[in-house]
């Protein structure tokens, strides 16, 4: 009888422990989800605020902030400094693992991708920009095929084409320009260039991780550092460094908005790394799809972007396909299978681009 009591006590203890572990897991997941949603929703709102809403001068007149390169510089400096602080706190070495020219190649494509993203907002609205970035799966797959020799299955290409179709429905059936511009074709070209450069960034970074034993913070420091140098060089070359600083100093709110933009991007990177480490890229991908959908809804409410019914259908087609892809990838993972589809998920998942947080 005594032994029976001991067994019951043991099973009760195990049950309580399992409940505590599950509660801890759920709390961590909730914090990770809240961190990603909060940081990147704030980032999206501030990004649109900086690029498409005018700022007031001291005399009451209004001007637009036009220096996308300066925003890239601000974000990269903040991210590099944050990574340096973390590395020093962990007692790790700041020495570069890969040759410097490897980081420069990633930084250059990363800079071009981010610059194109900011510039595009001058010509197309935020929902268009966000949905356009969801359509980068096909370019990433093509770049991965030609650069890394990856192979993808018919299902991978079907998913990519469905997402691309949803994007085209969105682009062709309603207004996609911002309130101040009618030159949407230039904005679409910039978004295409963004996807091209971002695809190269993801592929180059993946090759670096495979070729060298390095931490994500090593890439953060040196890629962001190189990107900062590139940004300063371009600002000096086109004579925009000091005018950008002057604009920030003479217009209320620009400094605060740009600082918060950089802080939310840096925080977003940290939460991304934590989420992938604790829960995996598939959970992160699902969170990011939800975040992108919510950001479009918020943008339409805050900045009054009119979307047609067919545009909403196109958006739902894109996000529905992305959710389906996450479920399929999860089944493959738990089934112990790995093929081209998981590679597609890896290269198109925002988390794998550790420096381009502008998702």
Curated annotation (Swiss-Prot):
It holds the Pfam family UAA. One of its GO terms (molecular function) is antiporter activity. It catalyses: 3'-phosphoadenylyl sulfate(in) + adenosine 3',5'-bisphosphate(out) = 3'-phosphoadenylyl sulfate(out) + adenosine 3',5'-bisphosphate(in). InterPro entries: SCL35B1-4/HUT1. GO terms for cellular component: endoplasmic reticulum membrane; Golgi membrane. The keyword Transferase does not apply. It is a multi-pass membrane protein. The keyword Transmembrane helix applies. Residues 340-359 have a biased composition (Low complexity). Keywords: Antiport, Golgi apparatus, Membrane, Transmembrane, Transmembrane helix, Transport. This is Adenosine 3'-phospho 5'-phosphosulfate transporter 1. It comes from Dictyostelium discoideum (Social amoeba). One of its GO terms (biological process) is 3'-phosphoadenosine 5'-phosphosulfate transport. Its main location: Golgi. Probably functions as a 3'-phosphoadenylyl sulfate:adenosine 3',5'-bisphosphate antiporter at the Golgi membranes. Mediates the transport from the cytosol into the lumen of the Golgi of 3'-phosphoadenylyl sulfate/adenosine 3'-phospho 5'-phosphosulfate (PAPS), a universal sulfuryl donor for sulfation events that take place in that compartment. Residues 332-359 are annotated as: Disordered. PANTHER family: ADENOSINE 3'-PHOSPHO 5'-PHOSPHOSULFATE TRANSPORTER 1 (PTHR10778:SF13), SOLUTE CARRIER FAMILY 35 MEMBER B (PTHR10778). It is found in: Golgi apparatus membrane. The chain crosses the membrane at residues 26-46, 68-88, 157-177, 184-204, 228-248, 254-276, 300-320. Belongs to the nucleotide-sugar transporter family. SLC35B subfamily. The gene is slc35b2.
């Amino acid at each position: 009888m005594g032994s029976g009591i001991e067994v019951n006590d043991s099973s009760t203890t195990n049950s309580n422990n399992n409940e505590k572990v599950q509660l801890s897991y759920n709390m961590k997941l909730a914090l990770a989800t809240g961190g990603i949603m909060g940081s990147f929703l704030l980032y999206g709102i501030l990004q649109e605020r900086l690029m498409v809403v005018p700022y007031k001068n001291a005399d009451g007149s209004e001007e637009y902030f036009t220096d996308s390169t300066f925003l890239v510089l601000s974000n990269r400096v903040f991210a590099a400094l944050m990574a340096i602080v973390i590395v020093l706190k962990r007692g790790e070495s700041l020495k570069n693992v890969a040759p410097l020219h490897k980081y420069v190649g990633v930084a250059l494509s990363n800079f071009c991708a981010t610059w194109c993203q900011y510039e595009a907002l001058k010509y197309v609205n935020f929902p268009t920009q966000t949905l356009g970035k969801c359509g980068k799966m096909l370019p990433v797959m093509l770049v991965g095929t030609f650069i890394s020799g990856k192979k993808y299955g018919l299902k991978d290409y079907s998913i990519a084409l469905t997402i691309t179709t949803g994007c085209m429905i969105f682009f062709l059936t309603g207004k996609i320009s911002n309130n101040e511009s009618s030159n949407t074709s230039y904005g679409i070209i910039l978004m295409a260039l963004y996807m091209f450069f971002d695809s190269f960034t993801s592929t180059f970074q993946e090759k670096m991780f495979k070729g060298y034993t390095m931490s994500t913070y090593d890439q953060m420091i040196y890629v962001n550092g190189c990107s900062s140098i590139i940004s300063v060089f371009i600002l000096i070359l086109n004579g925009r460094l000091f005018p950008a600083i002057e604009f920030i100093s003479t217009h209320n709110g620009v400094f605060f908005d740009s600082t918060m933009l950089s802080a939310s991007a840096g925080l977003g990177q940290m939460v991304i790394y934590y989420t992938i480490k604790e829960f995996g890229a598939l959970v992160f991908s699902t969170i990011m799809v939800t975040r992108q959908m919510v950001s479009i809804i918020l943008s339409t409410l805050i900045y009054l972007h009119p979307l047609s019914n067919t545009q909403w259908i196109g958006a739902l087609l894109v996000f529905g396909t992305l959710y389906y892809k996450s479920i399929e990838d999860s089944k493959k993972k738990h089934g112990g299978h790995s093929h081209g589809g998981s590679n597609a998920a890896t290269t198109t998942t925002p988390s794998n681009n550790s420096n381009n947080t502008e998702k």
